[in-house]
Amino acid sequence: MAIVKCKPTSPGRRHVVKVVNPELHKGKPYAPLLETLSKSGGRNNNGRITTRHIGGGHKQHYRLIDFKRNKDGIPAVVERLEYDPNRSANIALVLYKDGERRYILAPKGLKAGEQIQSGVDAAIKAGNALPMRNIPVGSTVHNVEMKPGKGGQLARSAGAYVQIVARDGAYVTLRLRSGEMRKIQSECRATLGEVGNAEHMLRVLGKAGASRWRGIRPTVRGTAMNPVDHPHGGGEGRNFGKHPVTPWGIQTKGKKTRSNKRTDKFIVRRRSK
């Protein structure tokens, strides 16, 4: 893994910082695990914008990732590591002993040729997936399930991990990167180690066009708009003279947005600001 600063051969290259990984596969992805991915432009089925700042971008195929890791007792060999345009983490193509291939999130330190396994009998090593009741307290894990059998939902982006800090009967207590402490059923699965490609956060796109390649459109300040477009719009000068709000008039600085009281009992400590 190398961090490369580009030479300033043009204004668009002057500030570019790339993360180069020579171990990534340079050919095409494994076709049976690809799906077509159509662009939504941030619109829902009514054609209305539900997510702003989305549109355009390069065509992509979706890679079918095995977040469940439920192929127990069958060892698999890592064939290669690959780039995935749909996520910040890299992925690994693994070949199981029965001939099936699957994509998984590539943990830190995983290399082609290594062997991994899932299930209660799996060894305690990076890349193996097993129920958290079988993982030692203090271990760092990723791709953590929130409901048994649903598939990993926590700690899936580049460099992410969760630490198991306690085990109490049917639940384990996890410390998330945000500082939140949360209880989850000990039957839920997790993959040992942390997600690889942690250097992803060091990259610098260098120009607006690089964001457009990724399907990200510009973010315009409300105070730069007209009154018809935003509550902050209009007026002379830059002051909008009111508490900051969203385009729909909802307070935006420090307002609580969590409404899922049903799962509050599982949160031992709130995330630190």
Swiss-Prot record:
PROSITE patterns per record: RIBOSOMAL_L2
Family in the record: Belongs to the universal ribosomal protein uL2 family.
GO molecular function per UniProt: rRNA binding; structural constituent of ribosome; transferase activity
NCBIfam families attached to this UniProt entry: rplB_bact
Protein name stated in the entry: Large ribosomal subunit protein uL2
Record has Ribosomal protein as a keyword: yes
GO cellular component: large ribosomal subunit
Protein task: One of the primary rRNA binding proteins. Required for association of the 30S and 50S subunits to form the 70S ribosome, for tRNA binding and peptide bond formation. It has been suggested to have peptidyltransferase activity; this is somewhat controversial. Makes several contacts with the 16S rRNA in the 70S ribosome.
Residue ranges, annotated region (Disordered): 221-273
InterPro entries, sorted: NA-bd_OB-fold, Rib_uL2_dom2, Ribosomal_uL2, Ribosomal_uL2_bac/org-type, Ribosomal_uL2_C, Ribosomal_uL2_CS, Ribosomal_uL2_dom3, Ribosomal_uL2_RNA-bd_dom
Any single biological process term in GO: cytoplasmic translation
